């Protein structure tokens, strides 16, 4: 997949993001100065399309064309989109503020896609960020703090099994940086070999050079489709994310005794499959009993050995995902699941050969000032809005480790995501870009 990085590089190079020189007059057209952005009288500062005479407008038609064009850079036929990791680097673009020595305000998302997915996940937050900054440029607005766009690599865990790989590294993932030196994909191609083949490799010991220090940005804001049905079902334009739930991933293995399905009587069985089934129900019970609707649990993988209809399972493998916005509550549920696994193994005379937590990231909380800026922007645009929890991984989860963070959601059709039917309307995208633009503008003046 050598051509879609070139397309995006062209898009960045053809988009005039470095717009404000250090000798510009900082009193000219700040947020308080340009027409169309009344801080005290919130009338709509935007036109409904780029053809309006409003000083700050979003070119929704051009943005949709870019989304459609980027969707053609895929390993699978349309309408599905497949874009898998090609580099460990992240692409950045910057518009200088009139006080460039201040820490910048950043925005961005990812453009990689799992196999046979849609064309809006992540892409709206990247191309929308470019259009948001261009809208500010067209208005004459000049930021105090510089504005940066980050294109994160490998947000999806498709190739090397690690989600948000780029943002994890930026946030100082020392353990990950070390592990990547020897990590291989399903075709036994190492991470470093894959990076070299794409022309982006660094030295083997140089991955730590991408680490960013805490407070490298004054704020990070990500625009994203909701990936759920709430906004569309309730007819709400904008979701203001207050928390990002983080999952813990658990691998469980039971070992029993196999045998012929007709030859071993029920009282004499040590069925690893039934132990797994009982644990699956225990996961549901513990999650439902957490006391919060924000706790969710999923058994996404169940494998039985030998996997024959007339054979008693001698081995069972499960992989469990537990998520919550409260880390202590999530971890308490995991402890209960572990205790249940041990009790079930004892009860059914099977062995609990593995209960391993393979990933346990902390949740993240949006910064109050970013929530307030996003809400104010939505009000000024007269858009309906609601506070929301994100239960999906996003790069913002890891950016929160080094920067104040916030997220903006827009509706998507029936909540579909990670499938070809994924869709966000041009109007909803336009609304999201407008809110992002105003939010960035507000934060740039802080």
Describe these PLM feature segments.
Residues 55-58, 62, 73-76, 108-109, ...:
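Zn-dependent metallopeptidase/amidohydrolase metal-coordination segment
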Residues 31, 36-45, 242-244, 260-290, ...:
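His/Asp/Glu-rich mid-to-C-terminal helical/loop segments that flank catalytic regions of hydrolases
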Residues 1-9:
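Classical eukaryotic N-terminal signal peptides for Sec-dependent ER targeting/secretion
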Residues 57, 73-77, 89, 188-244, ...:
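Active-site-adjacent substrate-binding region
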Residues 114-116, 120-238, 284-311, 315-323, ...:
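Acidic/histidine-rich catalytic neighborhood of metal-dependent amide-processing enzymes
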Residues 70, 107-110, 116-156, 248-254, ...:
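Alpha-helical metal-binding/catalytic segments enriched in His/Glu/Asp
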């Amino acid at each position: 997949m050598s051509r879609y990085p070139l397309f995006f590089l062209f898009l960045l190079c053809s988009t005039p993001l470095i717009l404000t020189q250090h000798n510009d007059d900082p009193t000219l057209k700040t947020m308080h100065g340009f027409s169309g952005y009344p801080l005290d009288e919130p009338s709509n500062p935007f036109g409904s399309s780029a053809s309006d005479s409003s000083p700050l407008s979003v070119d929704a038609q051009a943005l949709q064309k870019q989304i459609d064009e980027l969707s053609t850079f895929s390993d699978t036929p349309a309408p599905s989109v497949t874009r898998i990791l090609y580099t460990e680097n992240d692409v950045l673009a910057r518009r200088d503020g009139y006080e460039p020595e201040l820490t910048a305000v950043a925005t961005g998302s990812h453009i990689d896609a799992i196999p046979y997915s849609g064309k809006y996940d992540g892409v709206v937050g990247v191309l929308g960020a470019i259009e948001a900054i261009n809208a500010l440029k067209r208005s004459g607005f000049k930021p105090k703090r510089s504005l940066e766009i980050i294109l994160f690599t490998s947000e999806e865990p498709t190739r090397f099994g690690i989600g948000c790989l780029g943002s994890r590294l930026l946030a100082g993932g020392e353990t990950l940086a070390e592990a990547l030196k020897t990590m291989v994909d399903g075709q036994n191609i190492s991470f470093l070999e894959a990076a070299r083949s794409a022309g982006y490799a660094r030295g083997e010991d140089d991955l730590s050079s991408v680490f960013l220090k805490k407070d490298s940005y004054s704020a990070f804001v990500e625009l994203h489709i909701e990936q759920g049905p709430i906004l569309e079902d309730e007819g709400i334009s904008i979701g203001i994310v207050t928390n990002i739930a983080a999952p813990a991933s658990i691998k469980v293995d039971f070992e029993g005794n196999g045998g012929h399905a007709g030859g071993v009587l029920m009282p004499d069985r040590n069925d690893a499959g039934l132990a797994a089934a009982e644990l699956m129900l225990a996961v549901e019970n513990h999650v439902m009993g957490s006391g919060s609707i924000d706790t969710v649990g999923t058994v996404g993988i169940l494998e039985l050995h030998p996997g024959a209809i007339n054979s008693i399972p001698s081995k069972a493998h499960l992989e469990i995902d537990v998520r919550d916005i409260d880390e202590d509550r999530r971890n308490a549920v995991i402890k209960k699941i572990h205790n249940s696994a041990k009790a079930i193994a004892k009860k059914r005379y099977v062995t609990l050969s593995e209960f391993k937590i393979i990933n346990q990231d902390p949740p993240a909380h949006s910064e109050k000032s970013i929530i307030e800026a996003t809400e104010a922007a939505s009000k000024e645009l007269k858009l309906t809005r609601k506070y929301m929890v994100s239960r999906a991984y996003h790069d913002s989860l890891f950016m929160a480790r080094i920067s104040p963070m916030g997220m903006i959601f827009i509706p998507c059709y029936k909540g579909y995501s990670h499938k070809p039917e994924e869709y966000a309307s041009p109007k909803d995208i336009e609304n999201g870009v407008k809110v992002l633009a105003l939010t960035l503008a507000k934060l740039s003046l802080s």
